[in-house]
């Protein structure tokens, strides 16, 4: 989960208007998952927001942000034995 704040105690109120049919649909889905309407709405909204953020293809950085981004990309990767083992395996299509 990108924003762990989605799991924290609520400290702000969100108000929204919906059609009866929308509320009924949301309530039905929430009931299937054994969640309250509020929990269902907040969890699915956070998931959708994370997807939008993670699917970004264009990033607008100022010079300082761009330099930090490039430094992170150029930083050496920590050794990971699991990844090394995976990369050492012969692909199934080469067997």
Curated annotation (Swiss-Prot):
Superkingdom, natural source: Bacteria
InterPro entries: Ribbon_hlx_hlx, TacA_1-like
Ribonucleoprotein keyword on record: no
PTM annotation, UniProt: Acetylated by TacT1, mostly on Lys-51. Can be deacetylated by NAD-dependent protein deacylase (cobB) in the presence of NAD(+).
Coiled coil: none
GO molecular function, one term: DNA binding
Knockout mutant characteristics: Both tacA1 and tacA1-tacT1 can be deleted without an effect on growth in cell culture; in the absence of tacA1, overexpression of TacT1 causes a long lag phase.
Regulation: induction: Not highly transcribed in minimal medium, probably autorepressed by the TacA1-TacT1 complex. Part of the probable tacA1-tacT1 operon.
Phenotypic consequence of residue 51 to R: Mimics deacetylation, no phenotype in vivo when induced, TacT1 is less efficient at inhibiting translation in vitro, forms complex with TacT which binds DNA normally, no change in tacA1 transcription in vivo
In-chain residues carrying the UniProt-annotated modification N6-acetyllysine: 19, 51, 90
GO terms for biological process, alphabetical: regulation of DNA-templated transcription
Keywords, ordered alphabetically: Acetylation, DNA-binding, Repressor, Toxin-antitoxin system, Transcription, Transcription regulation
Domain statement: The N-terminus is thought to bind DNA.
Note from the entry: There are 3 TacA-TacT systems in this strain.
Quaternary data: Homodimer. Binds to cognate toxin TacT1 as a dimer of dimers.
Family: Belongs to the TacA antitoxin family.
Job description of the protein: Antitoxin component of a type II toxin-antitoxin (TA) system. Counteracts the toxic effect of cognate toxin TacT1. TacT1 is active in complex with its antitoxin, acetylation of this antitoxin upregulates the acetylation of tRNAs by TacT1.
UniProt-recorded name of the protein: Antitoxin TacA 1
Originating species: Salmonella typhimurium (strain LT2 / SGSC1412 / ATCC 700720)
């Amino acid at each position: 989960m990108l924003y762990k704040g989605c799991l924290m105690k609520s400290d702000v109120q969100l108000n929204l208007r919906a059609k009866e049919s929308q509320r009924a649909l949301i309530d039905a889905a929430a009931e299937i998952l054994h969640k309250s309407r509020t929990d269902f709405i907040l969890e699915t909204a956070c998931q959708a927001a994370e997807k939008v953020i993670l699917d970004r293809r264009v990033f607008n950085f100022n010079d300082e942000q761009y330099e930090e981004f490039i430094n992170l990309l150029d930083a050496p990767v920590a050794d990971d034995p699991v990844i090394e083992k995976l990369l050492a395996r012969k692909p199934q299509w080469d067997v």
